[in-house]
């Protein structure tokens, strides 16, 4: 028996469908959907997850051509040769520079230039209080010293001081730094000189040299140096300075070591260890002192000295030494 369709129900059903279609068109107009070809949809990839924003580095990165600083105000511990197993800051805050330090720097002049005996004589003559202090530290004279007596000591302590610091260019080597040949830096063991060279954009810390670096925090800093000289970079992998020694203290300690190391070495270089005591550091530290009968050759702090080396106040047979920094 055929199913009968009630006319009223048919009309109601048709009206319901029409209403639903109209409502759908209103909620989702045709422009809502982008018309994208099927082929393009198949070639699309999912959007990658956003990468995390990297944290800013605390280590200042020099721009190309810039020199790395010797000193800064940021504590950046690094793993270096010494101390082993402990990261330390190789670039401490800038050292204090006093009036006499500035006079010494002025005497040094441009990096790599020579310092004459007359310049050092003038420096001492201008600073009699410094000379008196050094004189008092060594008992008022540099004699009797074996070997020194043959040089006919000068009538004044000041002139003797000039001689021991100039005859082997010790003043220039230690306090100013030298350029040897075309690619080597000699000496350079005065913290204020490092600061001056940094501020003038002349020299900086040698990068990627951690295996050669040694630090006794707050006291001794041994590091590589690169410097701009005559339009090119000159470098040395191992230089160093005492952070707590100003120019007057270097001259005083060096003169003390010269007199205490009472040995007749003639023209041969003799080496000893000198203990530096300073109230800014908890423990004394050693400095390597080198001289011959003519004068002071070099004087620099060492974080890892040869403990078997003779002390400056002890007599010992002369033995060959390695080239000085």
Each language-model region and where it sits:
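Low-complexity, intrinsically disordered/propeptide-like segments
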Residues: 12-18, 30-31, 44, 226
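Low-complexity, intrinsically disordered tandem-repeat tracts enriched in small/polar residues
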Residues: 12-26, 49-61
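Non-Sec secretion/translocation targeting segments of pathogen effectors
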Residues: 1-2, 19, 323
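Short non-domain terminal segments
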Residues: 11-12, 26, 31, 283, ...
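Bacterial N-terminal signal peptides that target proteins for export
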Residues: 2-15
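Signal peptide processing junction and immediate N-terminal pro/mature segment
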Residues: 20-41
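Functional cores of ribonucleases/endoribonucleases
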Residues: 35-43, 47-90, 94, 98, ...
């Amino acid at each position: 028996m055929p199913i009968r369709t009630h006319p009223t129900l048919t009309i109601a059903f048709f009206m319901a469908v029409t209403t639903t279609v109209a409502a759908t068109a209103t909620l989702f107009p045709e422009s809502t959907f982008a018309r994208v070809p099927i082929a393009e949809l198949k070639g699309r990839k999912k959007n990658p997850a956003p990468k995390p924003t990297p944290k800013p580095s605390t280590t200042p990165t020099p721009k190309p051509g810039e020199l790395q600083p010797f000193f800064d105000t940021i504590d950046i511990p690094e793993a270096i040769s010494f101390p082993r197993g402990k990261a330390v800051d190789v670039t401490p805050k800038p050292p204090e520079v006093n009036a006499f330090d500035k006079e010494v720097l002025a005497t040094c002049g441009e990096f790599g230039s020579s310092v004459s005996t007359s310049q050092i004589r003038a420096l001492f003559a201008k600073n009699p209080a410094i000379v008196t202090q050094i004189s008092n530290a060594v008992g008022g004279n540099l004699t009797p010293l074996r070997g020194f007596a043959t040089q006919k000591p000068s009538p004044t302590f000041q002139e003797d001081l000039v001689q021991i610091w100039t005859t082997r260019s010790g003043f220039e080597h230690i306090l100013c730094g030298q350029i040897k040949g075309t690619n080597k830096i000699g000496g350079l063991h005065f913290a204020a000189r490092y600061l001056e060279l940094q501020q003038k954009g002349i020299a900086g810390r040698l990068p990627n040299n951690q295996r050669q670096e040694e630090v006794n925090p707050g006291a001794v800093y041994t590091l590589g140096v690169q410097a701009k000289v005559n339009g090119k970079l000159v470098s040395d992998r191992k230089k160093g300075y005492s952070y707590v020694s100003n120019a007057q203290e270097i001259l005083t300690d060096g003169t003390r070591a010269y007199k205490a190391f009472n040995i007749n070495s003639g023209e041969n270089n003799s080496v000893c260890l000198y203990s530096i005591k300073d109230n800014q550091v908890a423990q004394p530290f050693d400095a390597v002192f080198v001289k011959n009968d003519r004068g002071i050759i070099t004087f620099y702090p060492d974080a890892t000295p040869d403990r078997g080396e003779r002390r400056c106040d002890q007599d010992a047979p002369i033995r060959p030494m390695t080239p000085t920094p």
